[in-house]
Amino acid sequence: MTNETFSDRLKLAMQAKQFKQVDLIRAAQRRGVKLGKSHVSQYVSGKTVPRSDILHFLADVLQVDPDWLLAKDSTVNYT
């Protein structure tokens, strides 16, 4: 899996839920998850991939399977 693939899938999931980067940050704040604007920007731009706990948070908020975000699964499974 490349950072680009994660980024592409993250953007697809965000579009499907009509989420902007700020929506992810606000959801994180509500749940007590440390997620800054720069982190989300790096994930969306493909510069980095989140650690496991953040990956699972993103998947939960966007209602997708974490393996799909990581491109371990080719079919999207909205939960």
Q: Regions from the language model: what does each represent?
A:
Residues M1-R26:
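A short, Lys/Arg-rich alpha-helix, primarily the initiator
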Residues S45-D60, V76-N77:
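Short, basic-rich loop-to-helix N-cap that marks the start of a DNA-contacting helix
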Residues R30-P50:
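Recognition helix of helix-turn-helix/homeodomain-like DNA-binding domains
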Residues Q15, R26, R30, Q42, ...:
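Alpha-helical residues within the helix-turn-helix
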Residues Q21, K37, S52-L55:
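Helix-turn-helix DNA-binding elements, focusing on the entry/boundary residues of the two helices
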Residues L24, I54-L62, L69-L70:
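Hydrophobic micro-packing sites on short alpha-helices
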Residues Q18, L70-T79:
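Short, charged recognition helix plus adjacent turn
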Residues L10, L24-I25, V40-Y43, L69:
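Conserved hydrophobic/aromatic packing and binding residues within compact polymer-binding modules
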